[in-house]
Amino acid sequence: MSDWNPSLYLHFSAERSRPAVELLARVPLENVEYVADLGCGPGNSTALLHQRWPAARITGIDSSPAMIAEARSALPDCQFVEADIRNWQPEQALDLIFANASLQWLPDHYELFPHLVSLLNPQGVLAVQMPDNWLEPTHVLMREVAWEQNYPDRGREPLAGVHAYYDILSEAGCEVDIWRTTYYHQMPSHQAIIDWVTATGLRPWLQDLTESEQQLFLTRYHQMLEEQYPLQENGQILLAFPRLFIVARRTE
């Protein structure tokens, strides 16, 4: 897959950072020494962690060289490592693993989440936020356009679900706080919705298409978005964006 685009990702930085702020507010830790930010991207979530615990050793992990370069430039006091989350091993047990909008890209959560818990200190916390929009029109229409135009299914898998994550983490020895929130983002146009998802959810669908194929895909996608997202009285569009939050504290 082509590398991530930090500038495009940060175009909606306020909207993308808000869930990280709200997730961090629920982390029940006062003093921490070792923190990992999994899927740190350009460092917007890492900056929040550094603000709360300026003396902590914070390591951001991301598989994108471009994102890591952006994060290193923005936060010279933090450490950043280019690595696959599934294979990365910390040098010591962690007090907090923070994963804002990253783990949804990885498979096998029944194995991944217990593995992450095993990297925590006793009483350490795994804090996770994942977009839960697989059934939202933005993502349903990606699959429909791909089917119409005879492209393979390249989208991510749906999340396991609230009850499944509760059981996975409880069985891994955690106290679990889990909730789901739907944000309604005001978008000025249907093209703005495309701009949003092009930085994230649309990437796998477009990655292997030629420029002309991408244009055909996006033209049809735009048409279908217009059918599914009506304008408000003031001309804005409300984009519903559900997100799943988990704060799991290790007790065993």
From Swiss-Prot:
Catalytic activity: trans-aconitate + S-adenosyl-L-methionine = (E)-3-(methoxycarbonyl)pent-2-enedioate + S-adenosyl-L-homocysteine
SUPFAM superfamilies (UniProt xref): S-adenosyl-L-methionine-dependent methyltransferases
Keywords, alphabetical: Cytoplasm, Methyltransferase, S-adenosyl-L-methionine, Transferase
Main location per the UniProt record: cytoplasm
E.C. number: 2.1.1.144
Enzyme class: transferase
GO cellular component terms given for this protein: cytoplasm
Localisation per UniProt entry: Cytoplasm
GO BP terms: methylation
Family, similarity comment: Belongs to the methyltransferase superfamily. Tam family.
Biological role: Catalyzes the S-adenosylmethionine monomethyl esterification of trans-aconitate.
Protein known as: Trans-aconitate 2-methyltransferase
